[in-house]
Amino acid sequence: MLKNWGKKLLLSIVGATLTCLLVLVVDQQSRHMLETQSDHEPGSAAAVHLRADLDPANPGDGGDPANSAQDSGTFSAYFNKLTRVRRDVEQVAAPSKDSAAPEEDITANDVFIAVKTTKKFHRSRMDLLMDTWISRNKEQTFIFTDGEDEELQKKTGNVISTNCSAAHSRQALSCKMAVEYDKFIESDKKWFCHVDDDNYVNVRTLVKLLSRYSHTNDIYIGKPSLDRPIQATERISESNMRPVNFWFATGGAGFCISRGLALKMSPWASGGHFMNTAEKIRLPDDCTIGYIIESVLGVKLIRSNLFHSHLENLHQVPQSEIHNQVTLSYGMFENKRNAILMKGAFSVEEDPSRFRSVHCLLYPDTPWCPWKAAY
């Protein structure tokens, strides 16, 4: 009898020891999970909820300490709670499948596309754009230039003579941007998008991108050409200056501004104010836009790699991704011809910018595109 009692005592001790070990292991796992979650999401509600549920001395908000203690009284309840909370944490950490869902249902008619050019490029650049992407978006595209051109006006009724100088100077560029801004404000469009005359715009992709944002919010989207904020000096008075640093989207790649943000820019951009603002920092038009938005209004640039300028190596844009880009460009890069590398409907000699080949890739039903083009 004494021997049986000894066996029972030994089994009880072993069982209690195993139970304690299991509790310690689970507690260690829960603490490790808390530390990991804290490293990645220090302020997450799930992490706070986990701490409250697993620490009897810190019950969750709205919870009953007595019930919490009673639930924690058994290993089964403790383990079930740990499993349930871990599942909640994993669900919070998982990316949302709807993150790219449209914020606003818009069409191309909601976008004001401003193309900045100069008269000497009407034939060499604007005729190419008129034959390609503008041909499908005439009503949405407004051409801002410095000289009258009846031939260009016949192709599209949206040619606006800015009365600005034809020089490629800081003042002339800012003069044209000021007119672009004022014309957009006069319109009923939701989005203002600026591009240059060496840009191809995929309007379908542009609309898709802008639909992810609300035009009433403060949205400034584009691509910087610098790898750091630009440093400038703001003239406060004749004898008083201060340094300013800000990001700006390069005009050569194109950028877009929501109407909500554009209206807030009015004190520094409308009428003659834009020219005055540009003179305060003595920088060109696209820099002045960035200064007003980032430095004055405190709105951050949303960077998008879907915009491209001739200041980057365009050979790095793969042909398989051309249809997903918002803007493309061409020109010279490091003293070499800089354009999209692609097999297309036309040879490089026939189509040095590759815009015609890109257009036939996106719109193969274009009348002048070859029927059997190899891509």
From Swiss-Prot:
Disulfide-linked positions: 164-175, 193-256, 360-369
Active-site positions on this chain: 286
Record's cofactor remark: Manganese is the most effective. Can also use cobalt with lower efficiency. Has some activity with magnesium and calcium, but not zinc.
Tissue specificity of this protein: Detected in the neural tube, the eye and the otic vesicle, expression coincides with the region that produces the medial, intermediate and lateral neurons.
Subcellular localization: Golgi apparatus membrane
Region spans: Disordered: 53-73
Entry EC number(s): 2.4.1.222
Transmembrane segments: 9-29
Lumenal compartment segments: 30-375
Necessary cofactors: Mn(2+); Co(2+)
Cleavage (site feature) positions: 87-88
Coiled coil ranges: none
One of the protein's GO biological processes: regulation of Notch signaling pathway
Main localization (coarse): Golgi
Gene Ontology cellular component list: Golgi membrane
Residues the entry annotates as binding substrate: 125, 197
Glycosylation sites: 163
Pfam family of the protein (one): Fringe
Name assigned to this protein: Beta-1,3-N-acetylglucosaminyltransferase lunatic fringe
Record gene name: lfng
